[in-house]
């Protein structure tokens, strides 16, 4: 399936690597009943040891695709709120386009074999609604580290947590 859509992605070769490796964590976490909880997180860890790909940007793209390849389908299935979609946009910002994430999600779903047309249609309706109303890019943060320094904050170790909380409240 992936080979049919790769040319529609931002980085066709990187996309194909991501499709090949997206389930690489499954052997580590698959249970006796066949479920593979958190295989995406395990996959990112396994990918860290893959020496074939050396470009930092390419590794970041593939890691992000491995980590989030199931998120859109899960969001659609559970009718996730807008804030979940906006948080996902922030997590992939500058690493992977929403377009590429949609393609890997669809390839993953269609690659399993039988997919109910209603389920696939519901996914597209969900995604199109989110994109039309909320966009495909992360909302820029209203404050950054420079602002915190300007306002007199000095504990730089807390900046990341403070900025993440501020961004979440902004959404």
Question: Which residue stretches match the model-derived regions?
Answer:
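Divalent metal-dependent catalytic cores for phosphoryl transfer on phosphate-bearing substrates
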Residues: 2-117
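Charged substrate- and nucleic-acid-binding regions of tRNA-handling and nucleotidyl-transfer enzymes
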Residues: 109-171
């Amino acid at each position: 399936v992936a080979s049919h859509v790769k040319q529609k992605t931002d980085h066709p070769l990187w996309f194909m690597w991501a499709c090949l490796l997206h389930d690489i964590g499954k052997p580590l976490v698959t249970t006796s009943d066949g479920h593979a909880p958190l295989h995406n997180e395990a996959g990112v860890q396994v990918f860290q040891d893959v020496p074939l790909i050396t470009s930092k940007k390419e590794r970041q793209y593939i890691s992000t695709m491995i980590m989030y390849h199931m998120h859109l389908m899960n969001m659609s299935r559970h009718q996730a709120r807008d804030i979940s979609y906006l948080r996902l946009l922030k997590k992939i910002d500058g690493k992977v386009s929403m377009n590429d994430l949609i393609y890997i999600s669809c390839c993953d779903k269609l690659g399993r074999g039988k997919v109910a047309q209603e389920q696939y249609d519901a996914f597209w309706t969900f995604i199109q609604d989110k994109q039309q109303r909320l966009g495909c890019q992360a909302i820029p943060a209203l404050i950054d580290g420079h602002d915190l320094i300007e306002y007199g904050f000095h504990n730089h170790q807390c900046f990341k947590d403070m900025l993440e909380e501020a961004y979440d409240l902004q959404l």
